[in-house]
Amino acid sequence: FDIVSAPETALPAEAKITLVNRLARASGMGGMAGGQALDLAAEGSSLSEDEILRLQAMKTGALIRFACEAGAVIGSAQDADIERLGEFGAAIGLAFQLADDLLDLTASSEAMGKATGKDAAAGKGTLVSILGIDGARKRLAGLVGDADAALEPFGARADTLRATAHFIAERKA
């Protein structure tokens, strides 16, 4: 918030207000903080697929969505383009979390550089625990497809973003 709202930040006042508002929503009770509260409240209980998706959209999805929208706002993009980039960010946010959950079950601790199997050991509900590994991989491919579709109007200008979505889904650690 400090950087976005600082007087020396070279952005028009309207852009600063838009960014502060979007960051507040992404990080507040409708975003990361609310998602974390849901996550903590759900410890020890099983969540439905919809509940897991909502929680993940509020946490990782909201922050990555904001990052994508922020670049568009700073670049003075049209509202429709800001929305498309937000959709891209939401899709890759969910894809990142799903890929992370898959790696937690399928990758070695050595490859990950951290302990794996923590979610299962803690009884934490994930999409992988509901869909299974194959179902989760199919869902992950669908999320990458959603991300690609959101970028369609941008053509080749969005190739780096497309590559980012594919990297997230295909990473091994």
Where are these regions (language model features)?
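All-alpha prenyltransferase/terpene-synthase fold signal
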Residues: F1-A173
